[in-house]
């Protein structure tokens, strides 16, 4: 984010604080079918998750040729592969012979992929390199039996992919800059492409995939849900939001920001006095905190179940005990607050079938959560 834009955001925040105001939008309702209807859920998978890029891991997780991540994304098993020469590839994790998965979920080191069923063998570029009794398959030429590619790319410190097969004539290399829009320039400015993951987490979440984002697109809950963790750092129910299509950039001013009134604008740095949230639709969340960032992606597994992949990104791996403890404390602070949010989402999901509610409500300062749902509705034809 260029300095002139940082200054404009700080001026905007100071004006809201001075006027004891917050940015507001239209109140909205959210029908419970959004969280419980399996037919609607499949429309979300088809029209959203299989059409939009997702950040699936930091680039540094696949640092060397032969580094592989196997991960299930919206019902599609993927292989994200650092190939020879450093090229990033994405494939469906399924043998072209009889469909068996080549690798179990997780991070791997590999020189090739060997199917455990009949030993069909693929290179890191996805090409079929060998198969026993190859003469038995005149109807399946080796050149036509490479792994099925998916759109994928590496950009701005993350590995991105869309969980669907590349269509005929489609370039398998994603244009991530076009997808990120104007907020992509912020990520370039922060320099995430050289940062490394200090800690990574993966966990099951017994809630619809949308619930975690609702809680992270508003601050109305901070003084109550986070009263023992981060609430003291922030103003009550105050955020600033900008949008580019379905993407959000949300700024959460910290109480320390008022100290900037005593400094010349040339000395202002927004990252030191505010948290900056980037939500890249549909499911990638980046929290920039000045000297580090926290990122997570929520992947749906069923209408009432999802899985979270997250990491704390830092400029370089620490080598001293003091530095290790510093980054550990920052990561624990983030995940401690986030665990509070996720627990509340799980609690809400557990009441959906009780008959207590037919709709849920978003107030005027929860308008970013309402916009998120409006974008989902637009894309699935709701």
Residue ranges and their predicted role:
Residues 50-61, 131-135, 278-282:
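Short Pro/Gly-enriched beta-strand edge/turn motifs at strand-loop
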Residues 61-178:
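Rieske [2Fe-2S] iron-sulfur-binding domain
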